[in-house]
Every structure is written in structure tokens, then in C-alpha cells.
Amino acid sequence: MIAEIRPADAPPGIAAIYADIQAASGVPMINLIWRHLASLPGVLEWAWTAVRPLVASEQMAAARQRIAHSAALPALTPRLRADWAAAGVDDAALPDLAKMMAAYVRGNLTNIVALTALRMRLDNPALPAAVPTPAPPPPRAAPLPPLPRIEALPPALAGTVRALAARHDGTGDGVIPSLYLALAPWPGLLAALPDWLGPLYEPEVLRRMRTRVVQSAEAEAQSLLPACSPTSSGVAAMRPALDRFTRLVIPDLIPICLALNGILPAA
């Protein structure tokens, strides 16, 4: 399993950074990449200090929109409320699911821009740093339920989650995208995803979509390179994860998040 520090287990210093990530990004959860960086001594504070001005900027809001609009998702079959109910998501649960999906869309789009910019900064230390324009603070996001641990799920449900994770490149070594754990309260929905989002899960389609997201994120990040303090001694340890998450894991999940969010019934 990839090392991580979950919010419930975070010591005060890391918990304070997690709270600032939530406040600046407008998302209620701490994504896996940040939880992993927290497990590397000194890295979370260094990385977050570098990208925070970008995360909380007007440029970030515009970049998120452009990447989402450029995704060019394949056509998917609309799903009726009866389909959602059959998958275990009744009318009472749909608002909670919609809130969750909006958070994962925003969080993944934010992270792909910010962390791609950080990766490109490390690759190009002599290039000038951007001076982002601060945006008004986002509304405080309503909390989401804590993520279950994969080992705490019933075996059949854990198998479904692992099977979905295995569809994504970059998820070896026990990496489980947080989205699939967050959807664990709705086992029927998890089981339905390969059918409902079938075109997206075709390996060639998913690779093509991922490449488009990576290219879009790099185009946005070119003008948003963060200023960095002298590099933390742990930066070398974080580079494999930074490359893996910005080139594989996050851009693989963005089309899935956008697609699932897009087929939710209108409120």
C-alpha cells in the first residue's frame, strides 16, 4: 500500500496544512496525493507552500474550466432516476452523491494543474515564477464522510473497488483512487460503473483521454510555475509520486469524475 496520513490520524502540524488545503481549494476532502506527501518528512509543507498561491488564484479557476471543457468525453447513455435507484442511489441520496462528485471534479482539476506546475518547476528551476492573482476565498465546503479503508470493506465490495482501480495505469502497489473508496456506500453504483461508463473504461480510450488531460494541464501550467523555496531534502523521495500522479493517476480519474458527474440527474 502507498504510504499516507489520513486526516483522522494527522498530527497537529499536518492537520493544520490539511485544513488550509481545504480552505484554499474549496474541497472538503484531502486527496491521496496530499496524504502521501504528508508521509514524507518535510514534503507536504514545502509542496503546499509552493502551490498555495496558485490554488487560491483566479488563474486556477479559469484553468479548471478550460481543462474540463477540453476533455471531449465520449457520448454516454443517459441514466434515469430509476437506473440510479436500481444501483442503490435513491432520490434522498442523489444530493449527497452530487455534492461528492462536484468535490472530486474540483479537487482533481485543481490538483492536476497545481502539481503539474510543481513538477514542471522542478524540471525547469531557472524559469521565472508566476505571480497569480488572488481569488476571493471559496465557500467553505460541507464535509464528506471519512473514506473507508479498503481492508475494512466487505470482501466482495473490496474486490469491486480493486477491480475498478486496476483499470487505471499507475495504480499498482496498492494505489486505490479515493473516488472509488468514496463511492463505497453505494456498492450497486460501483458495480454499474463499467457498464454506465463503458466507453471510458476501454484501455485505448482511457489512455487517449489521459493524454489529453496531461497535455491540457501542461499547457496551463507553463504560465503558472510556482516560486519554490530551497528544495526540501525529501523532494527526491516525492518525485516518483509526483510524476506518477500527474502523468497517470489524476489524469486517468478526471474523465471518470467528469463523466459520472455529467450523467447525474438534474436536481
What are these regions (language model features)?
Residues 1-267:
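Hydrophobic alpha-helical segments
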